Amino acid sequence: MLKDKEGNVLNKVYLDSASTYLKNWKIIKEVIGELEKIDANPHSNHTMGKTIKGKIEKVRKQIAEYINCNYEDIFFVSGGTEGNNMVFNYIFNKYSSRIANGESFDIITSNMEHESVLSSLERLKESGFNIIYVETDKYGRVDIDDLKKKLSSKTVLVSIMAANNETGVMNDIKKIGEIISQYNNLELKGSEDKILFHSDCVQVFGKKKIDIKEMKLDYITVSFHKMGGLNSSGIIYARDKKMIPILLGGNQESGMKSGTVDALAIIVAGRILEDIVENDIHSKVRELRKYLETKLKESKIEYEINCNDGLKEDEYLDEISSIYLKNIDIQSAMTILDANGIYISGGSACSSGNILHSKVIEKIYDEERAKHSIRIGIGGYNTFEDIDKIIECLEKIEERRTSNK
């Protein structure tokens, strides 16, 4: 159930957490109250500045413990898009001069990635890099056998998202990491050009466990607004600081990100992460997901859950459900739901409103199915009543459509 900043319940249902998680205003207001008393530049060399700096470093260490990595390899940035660009900027700077001298280098990815990855790779392609797209299965997951075939001595980076932002389906990042590590140790032994492994973890962070060491990752990127934090804030993890800063200036964040960090956003993110872990928010979301699927089965709606048939519970995010509505087009569904105070989306919200239907569903199935598929994003703030309301509304739309045939 949607609430305002004061905690008052609004007669609206927000089911679009994959676009952005509703802000945790309770925590945000608590942190604002604390910072009002000690507001200062965390890089200032006085007591107030050092106090803020201490709070920021506490969050850095907290996140490092959560994802099992060296805290000195975590850098605060404006979010996933900036973090992704920083990874590719490093690769460009490391290899572009060698490409100019006639060498050839590959970057392996999939066509299911977020637009900030795909667009960046197109730019690298223009600069002479070979962009190799690995095959995907019927769920949109990376085909492990095809990945093995495409690794070569020319490969410098593999970039695969942890979970798809439009379907919630997860890639086997641990397995991919093991394959890359094996290749590095056997085929590239002694070479300075080891294959680096990057994963866009924007949808997964705070929902599923990420273990950097176990997954053998060199980079991950995270956006705090996807878990209830503030916009324009997140992290990049870069093993051994394998980065080149995009912004130059005061050498903040160990010289990797110049500019004064957003203390409010960082401290809020730390508190929200604590809340997620301590209150086991994921278990609540799982119950809501099960309830959604039960209510769909009990309803008169003709539907299918995209990319979900046969998957185990640990192979997809409970927070994201892509649903194919056989008799309802996405435009009608979203318009009528919106008019009834129920908010969902069709696909990614990261393309400035240019695309209504899911391009991922179109790639996996076809355009017609994509035009009849909605994305429901569940958050810890949702209720069983929210699920009842959207099912009730979709049933009414279904009845109108079938009765008019």
Task: Provide a role label for each language-model segment.
Residues 1-405:
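Pyridoxal 5′-phosphate
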